[in-house]
């Protein structure tokens, strides 16, 4: 208790001294002295009334920290300062680009944050002698325009190359259902007038004239088959002056092969060109054998057993007839005599057979030149006939014969 009493007494003496000093020097409050550092000295007066307190508790009031004061002063100064205008951030808007039926297509477009005030500030900072007026067109746009003009001039200077037209596919509106359209793919017909001229030129050939007069029943050369000849001329890709008589018969044979199921109608072309000879029999047998193999997948397997069957049959016949070996030696001679006899009766058989083989080879080459596109739609045939409907060829209709 003695320590606390002495502490309170000392504190009372200090406060008494401070109060007396304030009474003796009243003018110091009005004009406080400055310190040597240049900052004013602040006097702290404690007018607290002393009283008893709990033992062990500091009676001095808690003072505010220096950091809190500085924070408050900074906040006051920041409130006093005028608020600076912040630049508007770029915004995103949606604008209508196209109108599709009852639906709208929106395109995202960024709004430019540049205001007229920014242009004025920029013009005020320019040096004297500089045009402050804003440019109407950007430099990038000018460069792009100049590059476009140069590219157009270069394209005009270069010679245009004439390329052969290629078949294209377009979509045309077939029917309109409410707000929906049904599209149908249609191939563009690339038959040029020069192909019609080549066809008309070949019709003046005497052999082709005789062939058309020979086909009275129109089994090989009706108007649709002749229209397919013009289409094949356009697809083959040859110049019009290169088409000869053989190309006409190749295209006509290929048209009959695509449209007619009768094999005799195609053989009539060979009958007219090379005559009725027996040289086509091996070719027909070969075709018949190929057709049989395509219809029966086991034909190749069964064919491998043919030599064994012939051997067994020969062994059986030899066992039954001991003179079979003697007669067998005469078989090549008989075949040779028979071939010589047939050749004497028709000396043109060997020559005609080679010509037919050459015709088939040329037909295959002509088919490959068209890239295998031998099918022709009825619409294309109608367009071919509509080019010159008064032509005498289109009167060759089978319906008029019956």
Curated annotation (Swiss-Prot):
Gene Ontology molecular-function annotations: protein kinase binding
Acidic residues bias spans: 76-90
TM segment ranges: none
Compositionally biased intervals (Polar residues): 16-39
Signal peptide: none
Superkingdom per UniProt: Eukaryota
Chain positions covered by the region annotation Disordered: 1-90
Pfam families assigned: Spy1
Protein name (Swiss-Prot/TrEMBL): Speedy protein E21
Native species: Homo sapiens (Human)
Protein encoded by which gene: SPDYE21
